[in-house]
């Protein structure tokens, strides 16, 4: 039987205002699960017999805080299920949360020993040129947001130079190489063209395209690969929101309606789950 699956969300989950009010993370109501960041994916996987949970980490916070939150999530799930290990399927920054969690806890609780697999979907392992651009060009806006008490530390942690420093840290490289013996790592990317990408992602799409090429409107294929040995493939005609089941009118240019997209994405996640330990 497959170990429990945790769906780890990205940096700014857009269902943040509804998740507590409607208990979206734990709902067993399909209609409510369709409002979740991972649109109906938990319900679909549960119907196939998997034990599935959602992560719940701080909105737009830095990686240290988010990694701690994710660790607490996993420990609670391990206690509740009495499972020996957990599978993580992470979208976007959720993959970085998991990597930092495993590394930070390597000499303490050794949470990595309880992670059977880490699958990342469009995770910016090499950072995001859009984060670089935002911090370099929108400093006044960023300062105003901070004065309002809104934590956007995640943007700094998503800078390309910050991610490069982490990836090239000798201790990180040695640790993650050792982890391959007990944890299955695999990565996926998404890509879309300018006309098909969600309207709100067209500016970051162009910023990323000019420096890193093919991307999904938030993360380049290059950044999502992590290591070539882990890379499983690219979802074509799929932007950053499509990857978690959310349709937008621009997708009509790919001749794909909302029901067709959702079914395709659900099939994608079901395929991943079917190969997990």
Residues of each region from the PLM?
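Active-site catalytic motif of lipid deacylating hydrolases and related acyltransferases
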Residues: 1-86
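Hydrophobic/aromatic beta-strand patches that form the interior of the parallel beta-sheet core
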Residues: 6, 53, 119, 186-188, ...
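Serine-dependent carboxylesterase/thioesterase catalytic core
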Residues: 9, 68-173, 216
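Short catalytic/ligand-binding loop motif for oxyanion handling, primarily in non-cytosolic enzymes
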Residues: 14-16, 62-63, 96-98, 126-130, ...
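Short secondary-structure boundary/capping segments
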Residues: 21-24, 133-137, 201-204
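A structural motif corresponding to the C-terminal end of an alpha-helix
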Residues: 44-51, 174-183
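Catalytic metal-binding/acid-base residues of hydrolase active sites
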Residues: 58, 94, 124, 189-191, ...
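C-terminal catalytic-base region of ester-bond hydrolases, centering on the histidine
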Residues: 178-277
């Amino acid at each position: 039987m497959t170990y429990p699956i945790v769906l780890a969300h990205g940096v700014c989950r857009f269902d943040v205002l509804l998740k507590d009010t409607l208990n979206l993370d734990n709902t067993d109501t399909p209609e409510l699960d369709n409002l979740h960041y991972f649109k109906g994916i938990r319900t679909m996987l549960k119907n196939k017999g998997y034990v599935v949970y959602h992560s719940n980490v701080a909105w737009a916070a830095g990686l240290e805080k988010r990694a701690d939150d994710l660790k607490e999530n996993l420990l609670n799930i391990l206690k509740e299920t009495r499972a020996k290990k957990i599978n993580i399927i992470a979208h976007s920054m959720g993959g970085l949360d998991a990597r930092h969690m495993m590394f930070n806890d390597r000499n303490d609780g050794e949470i990595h020993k309880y992670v059977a697999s880490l699958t990342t979907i469009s995770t910016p392992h090499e950072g995001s040129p859009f984060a670089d651009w935002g911090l370099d060009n929108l400093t006044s806006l960023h300062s105003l947001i901070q004065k309002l008490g809104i934590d956007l530390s995640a943007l700094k942690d998503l800078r390309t130079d910050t991610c490069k420093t982490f990836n090239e840290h000798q201790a990180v490289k040695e640790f993650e190489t050792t982890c391959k013996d007990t944890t299955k790592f695999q990565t996926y990317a998404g890509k879309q063209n300018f006309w098909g990408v969600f309207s709100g992602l067209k500016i970051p799409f162009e910023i990323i395209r000019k420096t890193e090429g093919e991307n999904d409107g938030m993360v380049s294929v290059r950044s999502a690969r992590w290591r070539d040995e882990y890379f499983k493939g690219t979802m074509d005609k799929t932007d950053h929101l499509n990857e978690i089941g959310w349709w937008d009118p621009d997708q009509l240019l790919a001749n794909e309606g909302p029901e067709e997209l959702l079914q395709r994405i659900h099939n994608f996640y079901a395929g991943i789950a079917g190969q997990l330990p």
